[in-house]
Amino acid sequence: VLTEESAEVLRTTVGMVSGHADAITAAFYRRLLAAHPPLRQVFNQGSQATGEQARALAAAVVGFAGHLLRTPGPAQPGQPGQAFNGVLRRIAHRHASLGVRPDQYPVVGQHLLAAIGEVLGEAVTPRVHRAWDEMFWLFATALIAEEARIYQRGGSNPANPWRSWRVTARTVTTPEVLSLDLVPAGIDPLPDYLPGQYVSVAVDLPDVGRQARQYSLSRAPGAGSLRITVRRVPATGDAPAGAVSSHLHNRVAVGDLLDLSAPTGHVTLAPGADPLVLISAGIGTAPMIAMLGHTARLRPGRTVVVAHADRSPAHHPLRTEMLDLAALLRDVRLHTWYEADTPPAKGAPADDPGPGAGATRAAGPAAASGSGSDRPAPGRAVACEIRHRGRIDVDALPLPDGARVYLCGPPPFMRDVRAGLLRRGVPEARIRYEVFGSDPWAGAPT
């Protein structure tokens, strides 16, 4: 329980810690990784290079401290309160996908408190140190409890979270996006998972060592295999190219083995008959395809709105599969936004890249892998697609009453869309989102 004395200290020092958060987290990672080099395998070295991981840690720690100060009554370990639950669950699921263990938390706490002392100097009195140590252990205890539940549900062992999987198919869906189908390499059964969940994929890289990244499962359960859909992350001004995504694109072939975690992730398709609104951008379409496929198979009468934004139809991953699955639904509205789009000619199929404008028609029924031509085969069912030019416009989206909304895409995209949804009156509790990589949006509710 956070004591009254510690709450008072946190109140007077949280602004100071927040103001020096970048320096504190940089010192933390420097200290931690120098003392425990094997932990480099747990952390995304690309995000380390850009500082994104440090910013995410700072947002989570300061966000939890702020949450404790806003929560009335005593804070109970393992019961962080509704406002922070989504953030905590997201972090715990990410940790579970990497095999984070309870015995690693004391090391983290030691170096985090040492980093606070290094940066803030004499301002960190014994009283201040005790308060932040207390806050850290409330956070750690809540994470450990949630991670234990995840390991138990998934039947996984944090001491050995990886299982070997064999690549059975490799499909290039756009010039930058690759889908890999996988089956267990040994006698392990195919794990159960929920639409919207992801796996960590671990690979051994020259000069870097073992690195893991998270990839959504992009096919609904029940297919007899898992599928991940991977965007090749290009180098930018301040960030190197994605090491793991480049390895998967350049080096992995059918028949190769990959190490995968058990499926995790808390942003999953809600059961029931409430209308669904699935909004994505870029590779964020991957979990939406799993949700769409699951709904088409089990609840084809459910009201569904699908909205996707991309650079162009040619850059839209799994576009054909999205169109095919939408055609299996009886009450679906499908909107796409393309920044560089030449809509189809009048009377042409939706995936025809020729000139034209307006509402268009899309193909179905569902393609199993999203491979093949984007033109519909003769005689297949069609679903109406409304295609727009430019960036997504939340005001143009149909929003059924009582809908559950799911977002996945770059954090700036989701921040803007979420703000637009709130402005239109969608309750915050009905908006869920997934972020991959180090999460710079860690302090926002889900």
Task: Identify the meaning behind each predicted range.
Residues 307-446:
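Reductase modules of NAD(P)H-dependent flavoproteins
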Residues 268, 277-299:
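Phosphate-binding glycine-rich loops and their immediate beta-loop-alpha structural context
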Residues 155-257, 296, 310-312, 323, ...:
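Ferredoxin-reductase
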Residues 196, 284, 410:
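Short, conserved phosphate/pyrophosphate- and ester-handling motifs at nucleotide-, phospho-/glycolipid
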Residues 275-277, 305, 404:
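Structural motif
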Residues 207-216, 265-272, 277:
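Short, Lys/Arg- and Gly-enriched loop/turn segments at beta-strand edges
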Residues 1-162:
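Globin-like tetrapyrrole-binding proteins
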